[in-house]
């Protein structure tokens, strides 16, 4: 999706997004955009290179020895009722992902982009297991953004790879991450206001990228031969329910508020303003795509999924949370690019970009914009 946007930008142009937010897998993408805010296209190319060459071993330990140790520990904890050993914190060890992010993410570069005026804020959402509430960790050029005043779920901090690991820690599958004495998990869990961080940080326009479409009504015929759901299918269903998509509801609420503001004859209350959204959601069934690439997964993971009954189409939901192989990610990149190119003119109009705009012209316009009356702050919001 972002690669199509980057293709519309001059090669050396800075990011068109002054405020970047992300949750779950979107947090990893958002941080990459923020770290390369000074040279947007270069950053997207680097990000795509990583995703196009992904393998499970770069995200979690999938070798037979690691899987066997985890299995034995689970078994021993179960048989001893936890007296001999505590069960593992999760099914998989996600430490390889931390190493990968440490190699590719330079938050000092992000802070330099803020100092140079290319970026206002980055916010990463994660879910607090103790309070069952979503928290937005943010870092801004302005230490105390005016719009964030009274924001109870916003925590100003110095962002790091640890925040990305917390936001992308899928429950049960990957371990919770400790931040400031609290444990956090995937930022998409019970997320009821995915657009709030960007709005709180001052955005007037929202470019929203999601990966989950609105629920579809499958054309299914009732039959007495429907098999009982497997453990893997149930877990996949539970995760899918836990990550229930609130993106469309948030956009619908935003559009209702916009209409009320436009129709109101009196000035809006302080802090209430019209916000223009553009939402891009790939029109694809990611579970079905994941099922086609299941054999690309490590043999040990495939064996685990088979024991859980998640190796067939019914278990494709769970499979989609664990599939990090290049054949799968390359197909997703291609789908996202096609969807974005189909709306190329709409995106270019929204961002105010032109394919023929020179890098020099872009820099002059940006400088003039910052030094005089600024255009509305454009935010990039990325969701799982």
Language-model features: where?
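Patatin-like phospholipase
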Residues: 1-91, 95, 99-101, 140-153, ...
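Short helix-terminating capping/connector loops at secondary-structure junctions
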Residues: 11-16, 113-120, 269-274
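Extended hydrophobic secondary-structure segments that form protein cores and membrane-embedded regions
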Residues: 18-24, 121-126, 277-281
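C-terminal helical/tail subdomains of lipid-metabolizing enzymes
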Residues: 88, 101, 263-384
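Active-site periphery "cap/insert" segments of enzyme catalytic domains
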Residues: 88-126, 135
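Glycine-rich, charged/polar anion/phosphate-binding loops
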Residues: 108-109, 190-195, 257-267
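Active-site gating loop/helix substructures
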Residues: 115-209, 214-239, 314-323
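Acidic, Ser/Thr-rich peripheral helices and adjacent loops at domain boundaries
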Residues: 220-259, 300-303
